[in-house]
Amino acid sequence: MNSSFHLHFLDLGLNATEGNLSGLSVRNASSPCEDMGIAVEVFLALGLISLLENILVIGAIVRNRNLHIPMYFFVGSLAVADMLVSLSNFWETITIYLLTNKHLVMADASVRHLDNVFDSMICISVVASMCSLLAIAVDRYVTIFCRLRYQRIMTGRRSGAIIAGIWAFCTSCGTVFIVYYESTYVVVCLIAMFLTMLLLMASLYTHMFLLARTHVRRIAALPGHSSVRQRTGVKGAITLAMLLGVFIICWAPFFLHLILMISCPQNLYCSCFMSHFNMYLILIMCNSVIDPLIYAFRSQEMRKTFKEIVCFQGFRTPCRFPSTY
């Protein structure tokens, strides 16, 4: 849970648990830093905006048959992960308000269990996001370098099985987190997964873009060749690069918090960094808000479907948006 809630727990007489992902912001009386207070309304607003945006993304993918392709199925999986972290922080903020204002009374054990559930949702979300981004990267790789065999390799059934495997794995991770929340090994495993994902993605991208230059030139030299699909694959890879960049920027402070929490919890500088945990949660929620904007900016088909849903389904009146394409 976020650090402000954790401090309220301390006021209620609860102690921090060593394995709690977000409750371990160390307070040091001699630390020159103070917790950064962020209004509850900010968490609620970001959570609600992200929730609505990602519902719109999922609705667009379901509605438009042109988006019924593996890449957008994986994008839908990423949208569900973003929606999950938004729901977690949204309901957590509401719970904070109800508990601290005495509108809700819960036993200590129930509060601690609820804390674990919220943290588990964040754990599931980050693992699902990493796996979905990796799946999109593999899909773009196959699109660019195995273009003629793409339809046979990335079938709808196979992509569905991959998504099912991703969420089964993520749910298992969340369950393990609840069961072993007091163990620092859970946090270490989560950090290791994040760093491994970054290494895999960096290696894949380096290989992808180095070969893409040679591949594009070779295919463009063929007589009568149309490079539309090739450009589409490269465009999808660039979209993925944007998604990955935003993911790293928004989640890196959270994982650095976890690393410092394990390695130097009593150090004043580490304690100072960890005292701003609420800001790192805001960044995580911003990631969920920004992702749908990237989909809309990069995909004309997605943007068109957004217009149809918002203008015709929502208001039942046609409206016009400026097009950049």
Swiss-Prot record:
* Protein name from the UniProt record: Melanocortin receptor 5
Which species does this protein come from?
A: Ovis aries (Sheep)
Q: Which residues are glycosylated?
A: N2, N15, N20, N28
Provide Cytoplasmic-side residue ranges.
62-73, 139-155, 212-239, 298-325
Q: Provide the protein's localization.
A: Cell membrane
Which residues are modified by lipidation (S-palmitoyl cysteine)?
A: C311
According to its UniProt entry, what is the function of this protein? Receptor for MSH (alpha, beta and gamma) and ACTH. The activity of this receptor is mediated by G proteins which activate adenylate cyclase. This receptor is a possible mediator of the immunomodulation properties of melanocortins.
Q: What InterPro entries has UniProt attached to this entry?
A: GPCR_Rhodpsn (IPR000276), GPCR_Rhodpsn_7TM (IPR017452), MC3-5R (IPR001908), Melancort_rcpt_5 (IPR000621), Melcrt_ACTH_rcpt (IPR001671)
Keyword hit for Transmembrane helix? yes
In terms of superkingdom, the source organism counts as Eukaryota
Extracellular-side stretches of the chain, per the record, are 1-37, 98-114, 180-186, 266-273
Mode of membrane association: Multi-pass membrane protein
Under the heading PROSITE patterns, the entry gives: G_PROTEIN_RECEP_F1_1, G_PROTEIN_RECEP_F1_2
Q: Does the keyword Zinc apply?
A: no
- Gene Ontology CC entries for this record: plasma membrane
Q: Which cysteines are joined by disulfide bonds?
A: none
Q: Name one Pfam family in it.
A: 7tm_1
Write out the entry's keywords from A to Z: Cell membrane, G-protein coupled receptor, Glycoprotein, Lipoprotein, Membrane, Palmitate, Receptor, Transducer, Transmembrane, Transmembrane helix
The family classification in the record reads: Belongs to the G-protein coupled receptor 1 family.
Q: Where are the transmembrane segments?
A: 38-61, 74-97, 115-138, 156-179, 187-211, 240-265, 274-297
Q: State a single Gene Ontology molecular function.
A: melanocortin receptor activity
